């Protein structure tokens, strides 16, 4: 709410202690939403037992129970259920409506359950919308803190039991079963956000150096090419958005160019070997088997309704194999409608960022939106409750005007 309306309603200003309490509750709500979309299996990614065994029922109760807890916390912090008008959330809400339409004729309870879960997830995002656009980057910092906690447990697992954390040759969670692609995503997004904030003089140099060293090590051990490509492209786009105003950006680009040239000349064989991950030509051309699954998605028999609206929310797999593409997964679950809405939401964020005045919030939004765009081709997916939907929402939240909502304080 604008300060003018707040004064009209004669709402008293909140004290520092109350403001800290509000920030904590908003941050906790965001952390619970991240916990809700974390992967859980009763074993590590490579099939080994966890360092601290967690029964399957308890692990699923933690992740699935995080959403009701997030809703409760969001209602506590936003008791009047005030929401900020948002085109982005309006588009995402269309996916919820479409999911419930499919749920009316669902053959499996899982489709109905996932529809309600998506509805609750998006409702929680609506309840957090009054805190969008804050100058202190509250939601961005909350996301960085949350992902840092997840990565800390991953690194701790690597220290305690390297054989479990590096099972299968890729770094995954040994305390909590975070798979390598999600570990790499968290490391890449955290690194990208911190670097962009440092470029805009909103993060300390020593802190950025520490985060960079740890995140690069995690990315190296996770062997996830998509995350690295999305990170590089995202930082490049974000840097271009402020290269004319920040000398630090120009120095970074020049330094990276020199280092990249030296690496290409002296270590090209090592880098190529790491990127190949021991895969043959057939695996590379099929994107590690993804193209066969994508072809299976396209070839599934459909009637006209299913072409337009899909089969309903699922675990995004075909014949037991993950789809690993936001666009093909959207087509499977939500049809052409889901693809159009997902593309519209992403395009809205990018276009809004283009017309937003230059600044750190615009650069952060461009990094997140670009990261999601690059990753969307081989990862799922901001058409359902996921970390990618949270990150795209985070980008949208940075592009709204700053303001203080005193009715909530």
Predicted features along the sequence, with ranges:
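Aromatic-anchored transmembrane helix interface
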Residues: 60-66, 87-100, 107-130
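Long extracytoplasmic/lumenal interhelical loops at the membrane interface
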Residues: 46, 276-337, 353-357
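Interfacial loop-to-transmembrane-helix boundary motif in multi-pass membrane proteins
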Residues: 25-31, 85-94, 127-154, 200
């Amino acid at each position: 709410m604008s300060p003018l309306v707040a004064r009209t309603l004669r709402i008293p200003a909140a004290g520092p202690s109350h403001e800290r309490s509000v920030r904590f509750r908003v941050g906790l709500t965001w952390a619970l939403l991240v916990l809700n979309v974390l992967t859980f299996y009763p074993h590590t990614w490579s099939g080994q037992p966890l360092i601290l065994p967690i029964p399957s029922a308890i692990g699923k109760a933690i992740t699935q129970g995080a959403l009701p807890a997030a809703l409760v916390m969001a209602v506590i912090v936003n008791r009047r259920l005030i929401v900020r008008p948002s085109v982005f959330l309006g588009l995402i809400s269309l996916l919820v409506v479409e999911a419930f339409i499919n749920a009316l004729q669902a053959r499996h309870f899982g489709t109905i359950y996932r529809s309600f879960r998506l509805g609750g997830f998006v409702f929680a995002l609506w309840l957090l919308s009054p805190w969008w656009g804050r100058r202190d980057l509250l939601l961005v910092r909350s996301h960085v803190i949350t992902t840092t906690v997840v990565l800390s447990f991953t690194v701790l697992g690597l220290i305690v039991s390297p054989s479990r954390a590096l099972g299968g040759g890729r770094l995954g969670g040994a305390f909590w079963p975070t798979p390598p692609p999600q570990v790499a995503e968290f490391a890449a997004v955290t690194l990208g956000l911190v670097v962009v904030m440092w470029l805009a003089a909103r993060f300390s140099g020593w802190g950025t150096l520490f985060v960079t060293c740890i995140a690069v090590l995690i990315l190296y051990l996770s062997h996830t090419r998509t995350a690295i490509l999305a990170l590089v492209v995202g930082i490049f786009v974000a840097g271009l958005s402020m290269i004319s105003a920040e000398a630090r950006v120009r120095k970074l680009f020049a330094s990276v160019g020199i280092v990249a040239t030296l690496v290409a000349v002296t270590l090209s064989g090592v880098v190529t070997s790491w990127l190949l991950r021991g895969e043959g030509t057939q695996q590379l051309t099929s994107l590690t088997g993804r193209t066969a699954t994508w072809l299976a998605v396209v070839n599934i028999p459909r009637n006209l309704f299913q072409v337009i609206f899909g089969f309903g929310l699922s675990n995004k797999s075909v014949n037991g194999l993950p789809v690993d593409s936001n666009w093909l997964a959207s087509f499977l679950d939500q049809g052409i409608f889901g693809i159009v809405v997902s593309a519209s939401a992403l395009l809205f964020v990018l276009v809004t960022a283009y017309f937003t005045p230059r600044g750190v919030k615009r650069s952060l939004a461009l990094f997140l939106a670009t990261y999601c765009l690059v990753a969307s081709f081989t990862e799922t997916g901001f058409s359902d409750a996921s970390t990618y939907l949270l990150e795209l929402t985070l980008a949208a939240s940075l592009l709204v005007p700053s303001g203080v909502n005193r009715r909530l304080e």
